């Protein structure tokens, strides 16, 4: 079984609550029962810093409201579950938390920040083979 596990946080890469616990442990458990699983996650600075063996995979261009993004591949610490991080300076390289700014207010562009994996579906033909072979 092939699974693309899309999440906004996964422990130990980044954690704000219980979602990160599930998103960090469930892929590892599925991998243990021979699922071919990869995590797709926003490329927050903490994620990019904590990924094991991060490498550039590809650039996806012309995403609506987003422009271009880079896919960075690597692994989860300890479990070695494959990870793809969506790298975008405009979307994810910010002070504050993943969901809110340093004053606690939601980022105004959160729908685009967390909708980017959905926007990528229109570009699937550009990246399918690269993702499949990662």
Where in this protein do the model-derived segments appear?
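N-terminal subdomain of nucleotide-sugar transferases
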Residues: 1-75
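A conserved catalytic-core segment of Leloir-type glycosyltransferases
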Residues: 43-129
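Alpha/beta-hydrolase fold nucleophile elbow
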Residues: 132-134
């Amino acid at each position: 079984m092939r699974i693309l596990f899309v999440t906004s946080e996964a422990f130990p890469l980044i954690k704000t609550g219980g979602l990160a616990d599930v998103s960090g442990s469930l892929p590892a458990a599925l991998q243990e029962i021979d699922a071919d699983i990869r995590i797709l996650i926003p490329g927050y600075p903490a994620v990019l810093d904590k990924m094991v063996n991060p490498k550039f995979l590809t650039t996806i261009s012309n995403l609506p409201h987003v422009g271009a993004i880079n896919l960075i591949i690597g692994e989860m610490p300890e479990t070695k579950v494959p990870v793809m991080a969506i790298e975008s300076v405009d979307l994810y390289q910010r002070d504050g938390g993943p969901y809110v700014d340093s004053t606690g207010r939601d980022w105004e562009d959160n729908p685009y920040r967390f909708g980017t994996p959905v926007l990528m579906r229109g570009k699937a033909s550009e990246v399918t083979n690269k993702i499949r072979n990662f």
